[in-house]
Amino acid sequence: MEMSQRTATVRDAAVLLSWRNAPQVREFSQHSDPILSEEHLEWFSARLKRIQLEPIFLFAVDNELVGMSRLDLLTEFTEKYEISILVDPGHHGRGIGSRILHMTCVSFFNLHPDKSLVARVNKNNYISQKLFSSAGFKLLSTSDDYLSFEKL
């Protein structure tokens, strides 16, 4: 499966919101309430101004968008970024998440070989736990609701 990667643009706001608000995605999100369109557009517009520092990547197969990844600089650790991955619910179960994770890690570590990636995963999201573990992320810590993984 040939997958392409590109940086998000303003044209992607609607598809990102629809993916984020899908019930299957919200179930394991850190903030499980639906996001209003106005809130999303405000956040996304501000985020696009920092896209070089904190990228959002979109992934496509045969020119159809299938998922995204986002890298957030952790302000308390300037050497760490939090990675978030989302697969279009219509494409779950096809190995797309592992391809997105791999491609994002390659892009990230090519740009930042001295930094690390951290993933916060809902304790009930066993698929994501397996995804990050299989990609070489090590369990860093646990809380009541989340597991934190890190890849150096």
Predicted regions mapped to residue ranges:
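Residue-level marker of structural boundaries
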Residues: 22-25, 34, 49, 92
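Sparse recognition of residues in long alpha-helices and their boundaries
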Residues: 32-33, 56, 148
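An amphipathic alpha-helix signature
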Residues: 10-17, 37, 41, 45
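A short helix-loop-beta-strand connector motif used in the catalytic cores of GNAT acetyltransferases and
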Residues: 45-58
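Hydrophobic helix-cap positions at the C-terminus of alpha-helices
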Residues: 19, 47-50, 108
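Short, hydrophobic secondary-structure boundary micro-motifs
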Residues: 27-29, 56, 118
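Conserved GNAT-fold acetyl-CoA-binding loop/helix
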Residues: 24-44
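Acyl-donor (CoA/ACP) binding surface of acyl/acetyltransferases
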Residues: 1-15, 22, 60-152
